[in-house]
């Protein structure tokens, strides 16, 4: 191309030749007129001659023809012919090179050469060289950013970096050191070119306040059922009272599984006597001829040692007759116009077997037979109930007393009776339609088979007031508990002490990580202070757990393990319990009363058999201040036996 020819053209030998040529031009073409041949002799080459001669004729036209005027002069800018002609061979006038990029201009034979400044290229030095794209010097030698500029370039750094003295390399700026308060109360962590304000897990950085703020995970619906947010975290809970427990993911809820199925088969011909915690199961009213004497026959089954079987009274309440159980034996109490009497006797019948009992009023006595064998004969003056208007009218209550009759008895009795009755015949009137009444009511039906014990169905609790103060040391208290348990589910609260809305002590079961075993948890408020792991409690056998706790001592034992627990933490937790024991605590068996769901680690009801001894006293659920109706005080369903496999 043309440009390369320009670059390789031979340079004139030296400035001496230039001077010679200038003198020849003056002589030949300015002082004299020259034709093209004479001009060729001056330049000694064709390109320059061809370039010069037309322009020479132009100068002659301007000046020799006396046409020089102010206008003309201003047009070509030459004052006289000499100036006009001398300027023609100078290819660098007017300047053909880019002013920004050229260093100087070299006149040549009918051409010119632009010498470029560093950073420029092109025939006229009009093209900027992009040093940032130079393959031999990648990125212009800059470590981060190369900025190309007209005729040059410079290096710069990304945000968060500073330029080193060599003006090419960048170094990370440690914002955490430069601006110590940049993150406020959060922790500043320097990163390449930047910094981060870090918060602990469960907190989020607020750039406006420059502080860490607690994330309310509960507002993000993290939990399936119940959620409690606390600074830096959250906990999920499930409604144990509805039979749910927390799943392995600690967020979802799952049904508390049954680990030991029970035989809950019922029969409507068996009347369950403990359906109500207070009051009778049902009552009958008789309106019979006046010659009728009192009689009652029935089959009876119980493990309970005390309670009311039947209570009969006149309509005006003045006369009454009681058939009860005391210490496992039949007791008769009655009061009429003639006498008030009490008799207990016969053999013990609270053996869980069916016993046929008959009570019959004879002319001068009341005869009591068990299995048709006479066991008692009670003398009585006159008839038990006095007829009115030619009729004998009585009310007979099953398994309970009406109103506040307890106070009127000759000897007080706990009326509650966990037992079953079948084949009853009162006043010789047969079943008196009772079967039809109870047939529709599941709750009045008895389990076909039961064992000795107490049963918690996983739906309620029993409440006791127990004084734990040690009588010999007034300042001291002691809780010694023995539990005989046969759980049917692996999760539930067995025993808890409640003070207001808090639970200063609880003993619970939770399903272990293994399907077949359970853990025992001891907790103070909502903290587990001890966990006894992996015991197989759902085997169908009774297991005995013992624990004793005082203000500075906790001991737990099972048939396989005896543990005396001691730790600094334990002392702190026992101090919480000690404080509660100075006030009033209520004892609950089988679950929790209405307290906040997060008051304790486990809130499911206990499901299964359990007998409890506290400080040497066997607790009788009939003596509870209150008890859920479905808790059985003296009977427990048998383990379900798949009849098809046996």
From Swiss-Prot:
GO biological process terms, alphabetically, are: blood coagulation; fibrinolysis
**Pfam families, per database record:** EGF, EGF_CA, FXa_inhibition, Gla, Laminin_G_1, Laminin_G_2
Please describe the organ and tissue distribution of this protein's expression: Plasma.
Give all cystine bridges in this chain. 29-34, 92-105, 97-114, 116-125, 132-146, 142-155, 157-170, 176-188, 183-197, 199-212, 218-227, 223-236, 238-253, 420-446, 609-636
Give the propeptide positions: 1-12
- List localization entries: Secreted
The record describes its post-translational modification as:
The iron and 2-oxoglutarate dependent 3-hydroxylation of aspartate and asparagine is (R) stereospecific within EGF domains.
Region (Thrombin-sensitive) residue spans? 59-87
- Family annotation (CDD domains): EGF_CA (cd00054), LamG (cd00110)
Q: Domain Laminin G-like spans what residues?
A: 270-446, 455-636
Q: Which residues form the EGF-like domain?
A: 88-126, 128-171, 172-213, 214-254
Listed GO molecular functions? Answer: calcium ion binding
Q: Where is the Gla domain?
A: 13-58
* Record's keyword annotation contains Nucleus: no
The glycosylation sites annotated in the UniProt record are 470, 480
Instruction: Give the domain of life.
Output: Eukaryota
Any one GO CC term of the record? extracellular space
Give all 4-carboxyglutamate modified positions.
18-19, 26, 28, 31-32, 37-38, 41, 44, 48
Q: Which UniProt keywords apply?
A: Blood coagulation, Calcium, Cleavage on pair of basic residues, Disulfide bond, EGF-like domain, Fibrinolysis, Gamma-carboxyglutamic acid, Glycoprotein, Hemostasis, Hydroxylation, Repeat, Secreted, Zymogen
Indicate where the modification (3R)-3-hydroxyaspartate is found in the sequence.
Answer: 107
State its role: Anticoagulant plasma protein; it is a cofactor to activated protein C in the degradation of coagulation factors Va and VIIIa. It helps to prevent coagulation and stimulating fibrinolysis.
Its subunit composition reads: Interacts with C4b-binding protein, a regulator of the complex system. In rabbit plasma however, protein S appears to be present only in free form.
Checking PANTHER family in the record gives: LAMININ G-LIKE DOMAIN-CONTAINING PROTEIN (PTHR24040), VITAMIN K-DEPENDENT PROTEIN S (PTHR24040:SF0)
Recorded protein name is Vitamin K-dependent protein S
| Species per Swiss-Prot/TrEMBL record | Oryctolagus cuniculus (Rabbit)
Which gene specifies this protein's sequence?
PROS1
């Amino acid at each position: 191309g043309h440009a390369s020819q320009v670059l390789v053209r031979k340079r004139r030998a030296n400035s001496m030749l230039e001077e010679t040529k200038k003198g020849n031009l003056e002589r030949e073409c300015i002082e004299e007129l020259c034709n093209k041949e004479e001009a060729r002799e001056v330049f000694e080459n064709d390109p320059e001659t061809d370039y010069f001669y037309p322009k020479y004729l132009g100068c002659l036209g301007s000046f020799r023809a006396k046409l020089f005027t102010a206008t003309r002069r201003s047009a070509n800018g030459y004052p006289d012919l000499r100036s006009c002609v001398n300027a023609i061979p100078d290819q660098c006038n007017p300047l053909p090179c880019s002013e920004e990029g050229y260093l100087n201009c070299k006149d040549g034979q009918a051409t010119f050469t632009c010498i470029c400044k560093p950073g420029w290229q092109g025939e006229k030095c009009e093209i900027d060289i992009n040093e940032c794209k130079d393959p031999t010097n990648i990125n212009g030698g800059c470590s981060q950013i190369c900025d190309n500029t007209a005729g040059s370039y410079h290096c710069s750094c990304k945000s968060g970096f500073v330029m080193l003295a060599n003006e090419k390399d960048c170094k990370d700026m440690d914002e955490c050191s430069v601006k110590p308060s940049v993150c406020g109360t959060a922790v500043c962590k320097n990163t390449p070119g930047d910094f981060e304000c870090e918060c602990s897990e469960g907190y989020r950085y607020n750039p406006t306040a420059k502080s860490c703020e607690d994330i309310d995970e509960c507002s993000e619906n993290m939990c399936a059922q119940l959620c409690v947010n606390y600074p830096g975290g959250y906990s999920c809970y499930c409604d144990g009272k509805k039979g749910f427990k927390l799943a392995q993911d600690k967020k979802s809820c799952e049904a508390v599984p049954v680990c030991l199925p029970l035989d809950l088969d019922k029969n409507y011909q068996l009347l369950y006597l403990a359906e109500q915690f207070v009051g009778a199961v049902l009552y009958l009213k008789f309106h019979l001829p006046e010659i009728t004497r009192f009689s009652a026959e029935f089959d009876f089954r119980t493990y309970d040692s005390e309670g009311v079987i039947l209570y009969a009274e006149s309509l005006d309440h003045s006369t009454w007759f009681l058939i009860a159980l005391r210490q496992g034996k039949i007791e008769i109490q009655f009061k009429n116009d003639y006498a008030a009497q009490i008799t207990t006797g016969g053999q013990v019948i609270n053996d869980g077997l069916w016993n046929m009992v008959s009570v019959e009023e004879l002319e001068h006595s009341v005869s009591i037979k068990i299995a048709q064998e006479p066991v008692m004969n009670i003398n009585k003056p006159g008839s038990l109930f006095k007829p009115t208007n030619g009729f004998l009218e009585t009310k007979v209550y099953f398994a309970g007393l009406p109103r506040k009759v307890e106070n009127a008895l000759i000897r007080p009795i706990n009326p509650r009776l966990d037992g079953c009755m079948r084949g009853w015949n009162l006043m010789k009137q047969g079943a008196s339609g009772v079967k039809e009444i109870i047939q529709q009511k599941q709750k009045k039906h008895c389990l076909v088979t039961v064992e000795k014990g107490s049963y918690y169905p996983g739906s309620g609790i029993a409440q006791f007031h127990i004084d734990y103060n040690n009588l010999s040391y007034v300042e001291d208290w002691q809780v010694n508990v023995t539990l005989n348990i046969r759980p049917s589910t692996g999760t539930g609260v067995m025993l808890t002490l409640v003070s207001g809305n808090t639970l200063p002590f609880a003993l619970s079961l939770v399903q272990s990580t293994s399907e077949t075993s359970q853990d025992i948890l001891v907790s103070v408020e909502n903290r587990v202070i001890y966990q006894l792991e992996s015991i197989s409690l759902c085997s169908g056998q009774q297991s005995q757990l013992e624990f004793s706790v005082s203000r500075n001592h906790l001991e737990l034992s099972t048939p396989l393990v005896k543990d005396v627990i001691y730790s600094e933490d334990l002392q702190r937790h026992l101090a919480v319990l000690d404080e509660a024991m100075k006030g009033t605590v209520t004892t609950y068996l089988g679950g929790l009363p209405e307290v906040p769901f997060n008051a304790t680690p486990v809130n499911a009801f206990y499901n299964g058999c359990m007998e409890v001894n506290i400080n040497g006293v066997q607790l009788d659920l009939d003596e509870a201040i209150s008890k859920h109706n479905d808790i059985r005080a003296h009977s427990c369903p048998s383990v379900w036996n798949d009849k098809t496999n046996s």
